[in-house]
Amino acid sequence: MEDKSHEELYEHHFFEVEKNHDLMDWHIHYVGRGGISSFAISAIDIALWDIRGKKLNQSLSKMAGGAARSTKAYCGGIDLNFTMDRLLKNVEGYLEKGFNGVKIKVGRKNLKEDIERVSAVRELLGSQNVFMIDANYSMSVDQAIESARAFSEFDLLWFEEPIIPDDYGGYARISSETGMPLAM
């Protein structure tokens, strides 16, 4: 980041956060999007928004257009290795805090364990609450298809990151073969 875009970034006013973000994004495109490059852009982007907010004496929500009262939020955690009891206690805690949407991690070595966990959480949530799962890119296309078919009975809003994000053909295949809504 420093070698490629700092001179041009310094030439732009820090209030132009969006332009600066686009500039940084353009300068790193040849090394790939994601990974450490996107982390560096994110860190600078956050700092620029912070500077802008402090100079304007405004919160980020105000700079983004004001507080919205209709935004839905869900809760989730890094729970892949939790015992079933701990997982369900976490989900109960989310519900007690007023969340009506929950996302859990899947991608255990044994699909049967994932199915048991998804089934137990869906039972706890009931049909009135939204439910999503996230595999954090842990599956092959074939594993994701098998998993999506197994999870289809649990009324999931989406299946997030079943495979690596750049495999567009794989996402298309999972979607067409299972009908499962996917999130990348």
Where are these predicted regions, by residue range?
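Short acidic active-site motifs
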Residues: 143, 167-170
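Short acidic loop-to-helix transition motifs that present clustered carboxylates
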Residues: 138, 164-168
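N-terminal capping/lid subdomain adjacent to the active-site entrance of alpha/beta enzymes
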Residues: 1-131, 136-138, 142-145, 149-153, ...
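C-terminal helical cap(s) of enzyme catalytic domains, especially alpha/beta-barrels
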Residues: 173-175
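Active-site core of metal-dependent hydrolases
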Residues: 148-165, 181-184
